[in-house]
């Protein structure tokens, strides 16, 4: 389990207060689908995913990216109980969707890249370290039912 210090929690919460979940979520999920094309199999019903441009402009990818990032935002309200908070979502991804839990780690790492790209100078080493711990905690919580 990943534990953030009070300082790390403050860093992530402060950055997140500036995050536009639609923009950041859409880009993060889009990048996941482009960079790791095997992840597209979970989204085939979203329509055209044939090119990077098609993926990044796909309204269903954008909407789901926003939904995913909203869940990450919800995680900030439950940093001390991510596993409990996301138990049902973990179960869904494990038992029904059969998502490879490694995909959660990949998405988290892409999210950190997207945040760095959008928040530049504000994305200090301390903020990055805190964000990496946060996304690792989220990935761990979402993969919990697989263990």
From Swiss-Prot:
Residue span of the signal peptide, if any? none
UniProt entry tagged with the keyword Heme: yes
Q: Which family does it belong to?
A: Belongs to the globin family.
Quote the cellular component terms of the Gene Ontology held in the record. Answer: blood microparticle; haptoglobin-hemoglobin complex; hemoglobin complex
The tissues where this chain's protein is expressed are given as: Red blood cells.
Question: GO terms for biological process?
Answer: hydrogen peroxide catabolic process
Q: Which domain of life is it from?
A: Eukaryota
Q: What name goes with this protein?
A: Hemoglobin subunit deltaH
Q: Where does heme b bind?
A: 64, 93
Q: Where is the Globin domain?
A: 3-147
- Which Pfam families did the record assign? Globin (PF00042)
Which organism was this protein described from? Answer: Procavia capensis (Rock hyrax)
The answer to whether the entry has keyword Ribonucleoprotein is no
Record key words, sorted: Heme, Iron, Metal-binding, Oxygen transport, Transport
Self-association and partners:
Heterotetramer of two delta chains and two alpha chains.
User: Which Gene Ontology molecular-function terms are recorded?
Assistant: haptoglobin binding; heme binding; hemoglobin alpha binding; metal ion binding; organic acid binding; oxygen binding; oxygen carrier activity; peroxidase activity
């Amino acid at each position: 389990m990943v534990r953030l210090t009070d300082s790390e929690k403050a860093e992530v919460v402060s950055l997140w207060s500036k995050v536009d979940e639609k923009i950041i979520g859409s880009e993060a999920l889009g990048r996941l689908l482009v960079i790791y094309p095997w992840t597209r199999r979970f989204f085939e019903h979203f329509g055209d995913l044939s090119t990077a441009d098609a993926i990044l402009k796909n309204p269903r990818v954008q909407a789901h990216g926003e939904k995913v990032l909203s869940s990450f935002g919800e995680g900030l309200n439950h940093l001390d109980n991510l596993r409990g908070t996301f138990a049902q979502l973990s179960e869904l991804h494990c038992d029904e969707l059969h998502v490879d839990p490694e995909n959660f780690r990949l998405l988290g790492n892409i999210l950190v890249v997207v945040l760095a790209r959008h928040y530049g100078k504000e994305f200090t080493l301390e903020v990055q370290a805190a964000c990496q711990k946060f996304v690792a905690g989220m990935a761990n919580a979402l993969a919990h039912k697989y263990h």
